[in-house]
């Protein structure tokens, strides 16, 4: 027996994946950017068939879950290694305007900080307590109560109490000064002040006072008071204005209202006339600054007929409507009404009128035997005068007619025998020839 052929070497995984991707790309060419549900479903089915073959959906889901499980295991291993060997901590970055002392040093937390007191970040582990998760050994209700107790719910007494508790001891240690810290005032005005607020100007080491002076009123409280003072109801405004009028006033009735309205209208018309006269005087004086185009033509109507290069030659004349209606030009042309009696049919006199015969369409015209030469001469106008034949031509025609009538006609030209012979020839005639 001949030796068996060796089995082909298994292809590399990468080459197989490339082949599969090539097949998927060919089958789904032009469908990747389609958003339709059918196209997406088809693409998903093709990729599943090419990559996994005829596998069951459960097998595919199990394979995916194994992959995710492996990834999670790798992450856990990395986190354990980091905890054991304490890798290099990334440099801390603080946003602008934040005090570095209010942020816990990441190197100190890992036990790697070598700067000591020179470190710009805080080495107080209690700072992390404000942002860390709940601990089983710490009662979180104390902090929760303080977090809920914000400045929005405080009055002036509560605010003074919080300030004294928070900054009372530190204020006693500081040098005597009456200047209030601007950061402290900004925090109070913008509702940022609270139990966990830290002064950006140095915290407890700030040289300025963190306490409100006696009789201090916040800006927002001032604005609220001004708004309340300015807000007056319409009824109160009417009553105050009525009280200021006094007793010697005219009561409003229909008659007084109509008289007032008439007076106001007359004043308005008089004012309009005064304005028009003033504008007219200004226009005549050459001050046409506040005069409109319509008023210009009202003051000087002759400007309508003025022409320039782009205007037409039409001239417009001013006309009074009533005068034009009274002096209309009367039309002198006579007009006759339509009389129906004119359209009654009447018998017409046939004297001097040629009437065509009734059988002119059925009757045949007499045969003419004109010679072509005569026709040519007629066409050229030789023997025809004013549509009538000359006497010579009529004589010639008469002679020709006599000659044609004198020709003898053989009536027995085609006898019965000749016709029979003609029929036989037609029957025996070969059409193919």
UniProtKB/Swiss-Prot annotation:
Pfam families per the record?
Answer: DFRP_C, zf-CCCH
Q: Name one GO biological process term.
A: cytoplasmic translation
Please indicate if the UniProt record lists Secreted as a keyword. no
Q: Which GO terms describe its molecular function?
A: zinc ion binding
Keyword Metal-binding recorded: yes
Alphabetized UniProt keyword annotations: Coiled coil, Cytoplasm, Metal-binding, Nucleus, Repeat, Zinc, Zinc-finger
Entry's localization field = Cytoplasm; Nucleus
- Acidic residues bias spans: 393-405
User: Superkingdom of this entry's organism?
Assistant: Eukaryota
Residue ranges, annotated region (Disordered): 1-20, 358-420
Coiled-coil stretches:
57-86, 217-288
**Looking at the UniProt record for this protein, which Gene Ontology cellular component terms does it annotate, in alphabetical order?**
cytosol; nucleus
Q: Spell out the SUPFAM superfamilies in the cross-references.
A: CCCH zinc finger
Instruction: Note the zinc finger regions (C3H1-type) by start and end residue.
Output: 99-126, 175-213
Complexes and interactors: Interacts with drg1.
Q: What does the function comment of this entry state?
A: Protects drg1 from proteolytic degradation.
Q: What is this protein's record name?
A: Zinc finger CCCH domain-containing protein 15
Source organism (scientific name): Danio rerio (Zebrafish)
Which gene carries the instructions for this protein? zc3h15
């Amino acid at each position: 027996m001949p030796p068996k052929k060796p089995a082909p070497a298994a292809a590399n995984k990468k080459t197989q994946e490339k082949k599969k991707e090539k097949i998927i790309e060919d089958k789904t060419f032009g469908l990747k950017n389609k958003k339709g549900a059918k196209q997406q479903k088809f693409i998903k089915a093709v990729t599943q068939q090419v990559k996994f073959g005829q596998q069951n959906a459960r097998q595919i889901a199990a394979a995916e879950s194994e992959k995710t499980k492996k990834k999670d295991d790798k992450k856990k291993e990395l986190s354990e290694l980091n905890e054991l060997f304490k890798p290099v901590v990334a440099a801390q970055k603080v946003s602008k305007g934040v005090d570095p002392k209010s942020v816990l040093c990441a190197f100190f937390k890992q036990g790697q900080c070598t700067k000591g007191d020179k470190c710009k970040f805080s080495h107080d582990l209690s700072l992390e307590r404000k942002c860390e998760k709940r601990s089983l050994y710490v009662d979180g209700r104390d902090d929760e109560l303080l977090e809920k107790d914000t400045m929005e719910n405080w009055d002036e007494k509560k605010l003074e109490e919080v300030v004294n508790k928070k900054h009372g001891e530190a204020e006693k240690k500081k040098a005597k000064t009456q200047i209030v810290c601007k950061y402290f005032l900004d925090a109070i005005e913008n509702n940022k002040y609270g139990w966990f607020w830290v002064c950006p100007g140095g915290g407890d080491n700030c040289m300025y006072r963190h306490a409100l002076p006696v009789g201090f009123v916040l800006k927002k409280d001032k604005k609220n008071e001004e708004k309340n003072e300015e807000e007056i109801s319409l009824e109160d405004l009417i009553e105050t204005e009525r009280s200021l009028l006094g007793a010697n006033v005219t009561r409003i009735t229909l008659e007084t209202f109509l008289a007032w309205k008439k007076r106001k209208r007359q004043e308005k018309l008089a004012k309009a006339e005064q304005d028009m006269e003033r504008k007219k005087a200004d226009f005549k004086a050459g001050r046409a600054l506040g005069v409109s185009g319509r008023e210009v033509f009202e003051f000087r109507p002759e400007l309508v007929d003025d022409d320039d290069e782009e205007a037409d030659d039409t001239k417009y004349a001013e006309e009074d409507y009533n005068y034009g209606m009274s002096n209309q030009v009367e039309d002198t042309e006579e007009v006759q009404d339509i009389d129906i009696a004119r359209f009654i049919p009447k018998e017409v006199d046939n004297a001097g009128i040629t009437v065509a015969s009734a059988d002119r369409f059925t009757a045949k015209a007499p045969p003419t035997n004109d010679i072509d030469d005569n026709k040519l001469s007629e066409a050229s106008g030789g023997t025809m005068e004013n549509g009538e034949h000359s006497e010579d031509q009529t004589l010639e025609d008469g002679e020709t007619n006599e000659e044609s009538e004198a020709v003898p006609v053989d009536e027995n030209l085609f006898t019965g025998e000749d016709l029979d012979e003609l029929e036989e020839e037609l029957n025996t005639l070969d059409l193919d020839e």
